[in-house]
Amino acid sequence: MNISQIISYWGYPDEEYDIVTEDGYILGLYRIPYWRTDNNKNLAQRVVVYLQHGLLTSASSWISNLPNNSLGFILADAGYDVWMGNSRGNTWSRKHLYLETSSKEFWAFSFDEMAKYDLPASIDFTVKQTRQEEIFYVGHSQGTTIGFITFSTISKIAERIKIFFALAPVFSTKYLKSPLIRMTYKWKSIVMAFSGNKDFLPKTSFKKFIGSKLCPLQIFDKICLNILFMMFGYDPKNLNMSRLDVYFSHNPAGTSVQNMLHWSQLLNSTHLKAYDWGSPDLNLVHYNQTTSPLYNMTNMNVATAIWNGKSDLLADPEDVNILHSEITNHIYYKTISYYNHIDSLFGLDVYDQVYHEIIDIIQDNL
């Protein structure tokens, strides 16, 4: 099922939009405007919550569990107007006004462009469509990264964000342990040769078959689980095994090779910086300086709440501590001892540990 079909399957209303970025990418934006049994369809006064997915995932990550354990549905049931964005290059954002997806030009992007073009276009559309002055923003993983960049560099977008909820935030990567990123760094030439400098781990029929047919089988389920834990961290007791086929049928949802290389460039760094084009001359063309510029977190004044886990291989607790020290307006910070990188999406106890707290903070700030 696609995202709209998942929303409809559980009895919720859904709206789907194609929005166009300043540089011509066409992104899928999804909306759950109200909850299943709500007959009051007056949306004028509804509080808007915008959700942005992480690396190699899509908006489906917010609705992959049962309604009582999926943030997209939980927020709709709580009376909020829910919007879910998609970053360029994933399953639901692989279109462009004039570039073909088979071209290298289409895939010449990283999270720099997601922060510069995708997120501003998505938030601007959401704000105009709902006629709301401010919205609440929830990001997971890379969804927090592009939030940090956008809100620290584009003030007109930052002014629209009431509170930034950062789940498993990634900014500093000095202590990052994820084998996926480290292998990309170590085997850069192999990755580029294998992927042709275009898309990285896109959703395909073969991978969908593996996720929906093979992973549920007892002989394969441990293999699939170990792949997840190798990438994100170990926490087998907090994962809903009955939904494993759903997770794998939608993920990985793809990104660009350049985006993965960008992440690999940041290994062992305590600061987030723009993509390094590989030579002083090319950097000079793109940035008017010979090195890729750093992003300055202290320029962001958006109220920020953070949830992270001690078993997270992508958002290591030490890195999150570095990030926390640079946030000028932090309002909440919680570390969960056993959480890995995807527990804040798929954890069995995620409502108790994270989601109800998000709703409480929203209600306290209306």
Swiss-Prot record:
SUPFAM superfamilies: alpha/beta-Hydrolases. Keywords: Hydrolase, Lipid degradation, Lipid metabolism. It comes from the Eukaryota. The keyword Hydrolase applies. Its EC number is 3.1.1.-. One of its GO terms (molecular function) is hydrolase activity, acting on ester bonds. This is Lipase member J. The lineage of its organism: Eukaryota, Metazoa, Chordata, Craniata, Vertebrata.
